[in-house]
Amino acid sequence: NLSIVARKTGAKMVQISTDDVFDGIRHTPYTEFDDTNPKTVYGRSKRAGENYVKEFTHKHFILRSNWVYGNGNNFVNRVLHAADTKDELLVASDQFGSPTSAKDLARIILYLIQTNEYGTYHATCQGVCNRYEFAQEILKLAGKQINLRPVMTSESDLSSARPAYAVLDNFILRIINVYDMPEWKTSLREYMNERTEG
């Protein structure tokens, strides 16, 4: 296990975690000090991973994020693929979160590993939206047309069972004043521009 190796060698360890460690039943953002209460197998496995890291090495950075996108299979790319292959897309309007680019998450990690500010952090872009609003913005920036319909998660083409309110408060990042995460629409626009240029 990497946490055991980190302890033996004195290395710093970064563990990427998720909003799924919370139950998502309330309507205010979760801070690093809120009790975890995962409702899915995935969430329970991520919490177990967090606990394992905490147990075996104190030189750890646990970063919880959500709705992360970049290269590979993620919500942004699935929406864009659907726009190219379908006439209609049903998207959940009852799941709320903060879309976060992998690039912004990487910036936080690169900063933290140069410090000894060990602990658990929430790291998401600023602002809140639902999946339907997220899809609307993706399609607008891509200049693509598709009949987009807001539905409940159970009817959605893209969303699986996730916490309904997956909003994280970057409380500790604000306290240590390291890096202001951008607004989610700003970050998404940057990502989409890079896709076009690439």
Q: Each PLM stretch: what is its role?
A:
Residues 13-19, 63-65:
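SDR active-site strand-loop-helix element
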Residues 108, 115-160, 164, 171, ...:
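Mid/C-terminal beta-alpha module of Rossmann-like enzyme folds, strongest
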Residues 16-40:
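Active-site "gating" loop of Rossmann-like NAD(P)-dependent oxidoreductase/epimerase domains
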